[in-house]
Amino acid sequence: MPVISYFFGIYVRMYNDDHAPPHVHVEYQGHEALVAIASGDIIEGALPRRAARLIKEWCLDQQAAPIEDWQLAQALLPLKRIPGADND
């Protein structure tokens, strides 16, 4: 599963042809969660408060780019790297 963004130790990944709603897979220090792109809310799993806040802000700030990657993933096309909250 490609890493589409990495910031502050948070890995953001996306599967090709994954189930709806549009979401990202987030890993941080042994915690895993599915996070809705539209809202930044955790829809499955759990993250520490700080990581949850950072990923929510990232989803809301970068919303167009993860949605574009979601559409590429559904079409089984290569995904684009998205800048992290630390602007990497």
Map each language-model feature to its residues:
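Basic nucleic-acid-binding interfaces
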Residues: M1-D88
